[in-house]
Structure formats: structure tokens, C-alpha cells
Amino acid sequence: YHHSSQFISELYAVDAPNSDLIRYGGYLPSGMLFLLFSLFAIWEKPKSKTKTIGFLGVGFGYGFGTVICSIFNCDAGCNPEFINPSLSQIIHNLMGLLTYLIVPVSIFIITLDVKQNKRFFKYSFLLAALSFIFMILLNLSLQSHYKGLIQRVIEGCILCWIVLYSVYASKSNKAI
């Protein structure tokens, strides 16, 4: 397995070693936790429609998306040419695309609601922009030898934003 040239989903694709352990022991629970993170962030104060919409996007896109992708794994090699894909591959790809379209935009929406916190705004905007730019790059280069690296930049931006939000929310003793 090569992290820079293979999709993350190839770790748990059909016929991959330990795919069920990775799917059900790693990705499924992490998706549920991302969904819970988003729901708890919505319930925190101060409440706003903008924040609620943004966190629904993060929860649906990243949380629910990870759950769906763990249940519907991709075909062996993740079939980037999309030649005779299985139903599981089709669902996996559609959910992955929705995730990478929705989550950067959702982070940006949340960022708009916290302009008063300049540092959080600046880092959130940067992470949202980078994840969106790399999402476009990934979709333009599905055959690239660096597609795994590109995907990991997207994932890293999203995960860094979740940590960033958590740190800022905990420092202020309330959600941002």
C-alpha cells in the first residue's frame, strides 16, 4: 500500500487485507463520532442559523459520509476508471464526492459566523479554501500517482479544522 498513490478507501476495498476490521473497527466508529461532534457543536451556545447549517453539512458530509463509505466499500483498487462498477462502488464514489463538496463549503459557512474571532476566522478560511482547492485537484487527476497524497491533504485540512474548532471552543468554555 502506497499512501501517496492510493486512495484511503483502498485500505478497506473489496479483497483488501483486514478490510472488515478497518471498515467496522475504524471508519464506521469514526464516522459516528464525527456526526456526534457536529450535533454537539450545534447544541452548544451561542446558537445561530449559519452555524447550524454549517455543522449539519459537516455532520452529514464527514460523519454520515464516512459511515456510508465504510459500509459501501469500493471495488478492488477503487476502480478510478469506473469500468463496470459495483453498486457498492457507485454509492461509495457518490458519497465521497458529496463529502468533499459539502464539507469545505460547510466549514466556510461556519467561518462566516465567527468573524469576531480573527485567528479562528483566518485559519478556518485557509483550511476550507485548501480543502476545496485540493478537492478540485483530486477530481481533475484521478489517475495521478499523487492522488493519495492529494486526498490526504483534503482529509488533513478537515481534521485540522475539527481540532481547531475544538481547541477554540474549549478555550472559550463555549462553542465559537
What is the predicted role of each segment?
Residues 24, 28, 53-56, 60, ...:
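Hydrophobic alpha-helical segments of membrane proteins, primarily the transmembrane helices
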Residues 46-63, 119-127:
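Interfacial segments of alpha-helical transmembrane regions
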Residues 108-176:
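Terminal transmembrane helical module of multi-pass membrane proteins
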Residues 66-107:
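Membrane-proximal helix-loop-helix units in multi-pass membrane proteins
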Residues 64-76, 133-143:
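C-terminal TM-helix exit segments that contain a strictly Trp-centered aromatic cap at the helix terminus
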Residues 26-37, 96-109, 157-170:
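Hydrophobic cores of alpha-helical transmembrane segments in multi-pass inner/ER membrane proteins
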Residues 1-18, 78-87, 142-147:
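Membrane-interface interhelical loops and short amphipathic "cap" helices
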Residues 11-32:
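Interfacial helix-start motif at the membrane-water boundary
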